[in-house]
């Protein structure tokens, strides 16, 4: 039996990842800030709901205690919880913007991983997937054709990628990887300002927009990484992504 936790799993990619991993035979804890919403989604996908707010230390500790008491270990952690705020460019973005985005995307992911480390270490086949983004790639951001001008969100994903690298190095028995689902048609990537382009406008402009199923694919595959599989990598649906 494989015991898995997917954070931020009440909708979008997180929900689809949880659903797919249940179908793959894993016992999935579906992490949700709102337990009522999580209970409904878990029932729909065949998972077990668990209250988990990545920005709340008490919530994380309670989730760790529950999983420890119920199964004693954690085989797979999918660090999916995140926010898409912080779209403003340098010169407009504030330190407050950075703090808001980092609180969930970096400090939240780090807090969850730190707290669950003993349970992950207790697994014979430990796997960690940090859900990142191509906008966190330094190589892609410095490419001549880069169009990204955001500050907070790309910074947060670059930091998350560094966490992947360092955990992969510190725990060589674990399989720790970053996944980028690509731009995916969910409410996470929908308009965030009055003049923000819609998903349909982006698609019309020639940008590739993944379905939720397509966006979840690389995360699911990394969650199923075998003990001799890759670690310390950054991967999208089309293969490796440069750091």
What are these regions (language model features)?
Residues 10-11:
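Conserved glycine-rich cofactor-binding loop
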Residues 66-79, 85:
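A glycine-rich helix->loop->beta "capping" turn
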Residues 24-40:
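Conserved glycine-rich Rossmann-like NAD(P)H-binding loop of the short-chain dehydrogenase/reductase
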Residues 78, 112-116, 120, 163-164:
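Hydrophobic positions on the long internal alpha-helix
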Residues 51-62, 95:
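The beta1-alpha1 cofactor-binding region of Rossmann-like NAD(H)/NADP(H)-dependent oxidoreductases
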Residues 158, 173-174, 178, 194-243:
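C-terminal helical subdomain
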Residues 83, 91-102, 121-172, 183:
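Catalytic loop of short-chain dehydrogenase/reductase
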């Amino acid at each position: 039996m494989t015991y898995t936790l997917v954070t931020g799993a009440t909708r979008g990619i997180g929900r689809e990842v949880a659903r797919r991993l249940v179908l793959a035979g894993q016992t999935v804890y579906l992490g949700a800030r709102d337990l009522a919403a999580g209970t409904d989604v878990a029932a729909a996908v065949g998972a077990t709901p668990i209250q988990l707010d990545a920005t709340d230390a008490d919530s994380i500790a309670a989730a760790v205690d529950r999983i420890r008491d119920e199964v004693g270990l954690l085989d797979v952690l999918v660090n999916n919880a995140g926010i898409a705020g912080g779209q403003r460019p340098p010169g407009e973005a504030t330190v407050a913007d950075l703090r808001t985005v980092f609180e969930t995307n970096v400090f939240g992911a780090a807090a969850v991983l730190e707290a669950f480390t003993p349970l992950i270490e207790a697994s014979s086949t430990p796997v960690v997937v940090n859900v990142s983004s191509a906008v966190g790639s330094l190589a892609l951001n410095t490419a001549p054709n880069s169009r990204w001008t955001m500050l907070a969100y790309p910074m947060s994903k670059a930091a998350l990628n560094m966490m992947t690298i360092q955990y992969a190095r510190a725990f060589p028995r674990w399989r720790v990887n970053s996944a980028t689902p690509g731009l995916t048609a969910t409410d996470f990537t929908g308009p965030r300002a009055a003049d923000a382009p819609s998903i349909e406008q982006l698609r019309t402009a020639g940008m590739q927009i993944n379905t939720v199923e397509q966006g979840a694919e690389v995360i699911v595959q990394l969650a199923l990484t075998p003990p001799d599989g890759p670690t310390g990598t950054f991967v999208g649906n089309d293969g490796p992504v440069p750091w």
